[in-house]
Amino acid sequence: MDYLSSMGSQTARFCLILLFLFYYLPCALSQDDLWGCGTPFRCGNITAGFPFLGGIRGEVCGHHSLKLNCNKHSNTTSLIFSGHNYTVLYIDNNNNSVTLGLSRQDFSGPFCSASFSSTLLSSGLFQNLPSYKSLTVFYACDPRRHFLGNFTCPVKGLGSIIQNSTYGILCDGSFSVPVPTSFVSEEEVLDLTHLESVLRKGFEVKLNIDEIPCPLECFSSRANCLFLAGSCCKYHDRTTTCGGDTGDLLREIIPNTRSILITIGQVVGFHVFIIVVMIIAFLFWRRKKVNDLRKQNLEALVTSRRYSYRQIKKITKSFTEVVGRGGFGTVYKGNLRDGRKVAVKILKDSNGNCEDFINEVASISQTSHVNIVSLLGFCFEKSKRAIVYEFLENGSLDQSSNLDVSTLYGIALGVARGIEYLHFGCKKRIVHFDIKPQNVLLDENLKPKVADFGLAKLCEKQESILSLLDTRGTIGYIAPELFSRVYGNVSHKSDVYSYGMLVLEMTGARNKERVQNADSNNSSAYFPDWIFKDLENGDYVKLLADGLTREEEDIAKKMILVGLWCIQFRPSDRPSMNKVVGMMEGNLDSLDPPPKPLLHMPMQNNNAESSQPSEEDSSIYSEV
């Protein structure tokens, strides 16, 4: 329910953002653009109204190809057309026509540095004046030939401005520019210096607009002219008359209430459709992401042997020998056909999702380490789910007693190496989230193996923060950040805390009479306080059995120091597991005393699980 509520809240916020972006914002901008049409563009000596754009004149105020730009530093106006920047020298509105003086900006400098491309203006929008003519400039010509009116550019090579049709064959490139007809003379040899001067002066063109008074009539009737295709349309009593059959069309819109409502209805309908499509696409994306993750985990199952439920019953002799019980299910002892002993965990029947089962099988399938329990197979038939592990004769750590300090140290070091492998040695990082004595199994040589990955989470190694929707683990071993994010973010450092509590229990739980509260049942939650006090007073030896050698005392103190380092409340203060292994393998003298924890955990039974209902472990072999 938390997930669905969170997802619904995210979807609602997503819809509101889309509604603002696709409806309210465009509507506001379109209204501003519409009423900005009454203000002419002004820059330096240039004043221009319809059909030009620029300044506060929006896209609806004129033709999209006639957008003017103002350089406020030089007070000059420019126009971009067909890939060229033009300086607008003047705009002349006389005799119901618009004449522009234009100069290509790349011709303002040396001719050889200009763009050797033709000046092309749309014949539908612009009309060439008879006083100007097109001049062809040839370049990249054959240097072995002689050309009249030639010039040489460093990059473009030999060129000519003589209008000779045969030059087009002898030269690799050419382009055309407008020049006054008086400049072009086929008889005389043209000079490049003269051409540069003429090009800087620019040329004139006329707009193909039939009528100019249209904007004044539009504004007097509180309407606006829009540029479409044809000529100028006038509004008289909400009717439209168009002048001329050629050129571009100007349409007026009178902002009456009915037209505004129709426009709003069209805009809302269109954008609601877009929003619905995007929401559906978003939900499909989320579903695909979840399915891809589940598929990725299921693919890991293929590498392990799959047993039928009938085979599982045969392996366990119809579930006759129970070796452990727990919140997730019951563990039975069994034998494979080759004689190997196995532990078979039968998960409780569930018709819901199988995430816990997939987590455990997928996690263990990706591991291969001497300190990680080996997965031998699984069963997945509808609601029947089972996991087959190697069987370890000595059961779990919590059932083992009378272990000497050296053996305890070897177990603690092995567990540290196993967790380090989960965090750094696998293709994907595995965070266990339930490190405790019941989940540390011992083989015939008392070598430890980390087991029970039902609460594990797989993530990429670069992920430093994990997202969890529930608190998982066992009270007394759960890191503070799993209870409240005020302590920090959940990460692989949560396993470090659990490991520290495990090590402290291995050392401090040996003198249970030290705990003053008889009802506390020696909860591991109280270890840090009184162990730290004994450590400060130099009485750490009292935590262990009598008759220890000096070497065993040093080992015990090192384990205590490492444990206290691991249970720091802030995750950033805890060492990573690879550093923990180094501390355990290193010398006691190289370890600095850790800071004293400022808080202590609530008093609880250390076998209670917060993520799942727990049951009392009733055998020598805990649930794996």
Curated annotation (Swiss-Prot):
Principal place of residence: membrane
Amino acid composition bias (Polar residues), ranges on this chain: 603-624
Gene3D superfamilies per UniProt: Phosphorylase Kinase, domain 1, Transferase(Phosphotransferase) domain 1
Reactions accelerated catalytically: L-seryl-[protein] + ATP = O-phospho-L-seryl-[protein] + ADP + H(+); L-threonyl-[protein] + ATP = O-phospho-L-threonyl-[protein] + ADP + H(+)
Transmembrane segments: 264-284
Coiled coil: none
Entry annotation: catalytic residues: 434
Membrane disposition: Single-pass type I membrane protein
Glycosylation sites recorded in the entry for this protein: 45, 75, 85, 95, 150, 164
Protein name: LEAF RUST 10 DISEASE-RESISTANCE LOCUS RECEPTOR-LIKE PROTEIN KINASE-like 2.2
Origin species: Arabidopsis thaliana
